[in-house]
Amino acid sequence: MKILDINKCSVAEAPGISVVLFVAGCLPNKCEEGNCPGCHNKEAQKFSYGKEFTPETKYEILEAVKQPYIHTFVLCGGEPLDQDLNELIDLIKSIKEQCLNRDIWCYTGYEWEQVKDLEIMQYIDVAVVGPFILEQRDISDANRWRGSRNQRVIDVKKSLEQNKKVFLEGIPNNN
């Protein structure tokens, strides 16, 4: 797996202060010819871009997430769910074990129905699902944590427990 960046102090992707891992690569099935119009991270579309995820990278992320002011670890892309999920599951398990009380968020261009049965979802707390659609772009407070109005913020734990899609509470226009 290749990564583009680790943002160790972000307030843009989730409530509070987050550590964000940007992975490289996405498959063309979610976007027009693999090139989403208006893509926020065009360089992240190529699997060959960036640097290798290594044990040192994992250590760097864990040390960043351990900081007392960090609330959340966020997976962004590219497309996190088009990566080696075993590597990501291992990373998330380590975060859950070593960094208690940290939420895990995942941004994906897939719909909930496409990803709910993936093993990695057992370790994710919140998923922002759905492809970015340029014509529905909305970065206002009314569309918090999403890039376009079609995207939804899913409470993954409750959704898996109740075996139905449960939207994260407190997010306007989220159903």
Residue ranges and their predicted role:
Residues 1-3:
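Extreme N-terminal starter segment of soluble prokaryotic enzymes
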Residues 45-60, 82-121, 126:
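Canonical radical SAM enzyme core domain
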Residues 121, 126-175:
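Classical nucleotidyltransferase
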Residues 77, 108-110, 130-132:
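Short secondary-structure boundary segments
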Residues 34, 68, 122:
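Structured loop/turn residues at beta-strand edges in well-structured enzyme cores
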Residues 69-94, 143, 157:
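Conserved glycine-rich "GG(E/T)P / GGGxP" loop and the immediately following alpha-helix
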Residues 19, 73, 104-106, 129:
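Hydrophobic faces of well-ordered beta-strands that scaffold small-molecule active sites
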Residues 11-55:
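Canonical Radical SAM [4Fe-4S] cluster-binding loop centered on the CxxxCxxC motif
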